[in-house]
């Protein structure tokens, strides 16, 4: 029998503990995988984002312990992963709008400035 600890704080100002974080994150990763389909299968961003998202979703589906999930993904607390996934959903739109895969000169990629404002 495993014991799951419930943390009281993330220790990050403004970022509250999410009691349903695993469920929320799995949903966001599934949304992201679906949304990535708007990009061409050959687009570099789509390929790398799909690989990372599938890996992370696999961790979440196969592990129930939040600490183990955080350690395996190794990209912050699960609440931070939720923020990252929400931002990734926005980035897909930016990549799609800019049509970054159609660059005339692949040695001079455009600079995409992302702001949460």
UniProtKB/Swiss-Prot annotation:
Entry keyword Disulfide bond: no
Subunit-level organization: Complex I is composed of about 45 different subunits.
Membrane topology: Peripheral membrane protein
Identification of the protein by name: Probable NADH dehydrogenase [ubiquinone] 1 alpha subcomplex subunit 5
Gene: ndufa5
Disulphide connectivity of cysteines: none
Location(s), subcellular: Mitochondrion inner membrane
Gene Ontology cellular-component terms listed: mitochondrial inner membrane; respiratory chain complex I
UniProt record, GO biological process: respiratory electron transport chain
Primary location recorded for the protein, binned into one broad class: mitochondrion
InterPro entries assigned to the protein according to its UniProt record, in alphabetical order: NDUFA5
Family, per entry: Belongs to the complex I NDUFA5 subunit family.
Function (record text): Accessory subunit of the mitochondrial membrane respiratory chain NADH dehydrogenase (Complex I), that is believed not to be involved in catalysis. Complex I functions in the transfer of electrons from NADH to the respiratory chain. The immediate electron acceptor for the enzyme is believed to be ubiquinone.
């Amino acid at each position: 029998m495993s014991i799951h600890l419930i943390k009281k704080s993330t220790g990050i100002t403004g970022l509250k503990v999410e009691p349903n974080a695993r469920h929320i994150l799995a949903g966001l990763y599934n949304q992201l995988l679906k949304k990535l389909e708007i990009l061409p299968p050959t687009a570099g961003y789509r390929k790398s984002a799909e690989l990372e998202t599938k890996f992370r979703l696999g961790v979440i589906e196969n592990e129930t312990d939040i600490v183990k999930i955080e350690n395996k993904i190794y990209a912050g607390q699960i609440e931070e992963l939720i923020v990252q996934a929400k931002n990734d959903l926005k980035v897909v739109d930016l990549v799609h709008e800019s049509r970054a895969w159609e660059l005339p000169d692949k040695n001079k990629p455009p600079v995409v400035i992302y702001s949460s404002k």
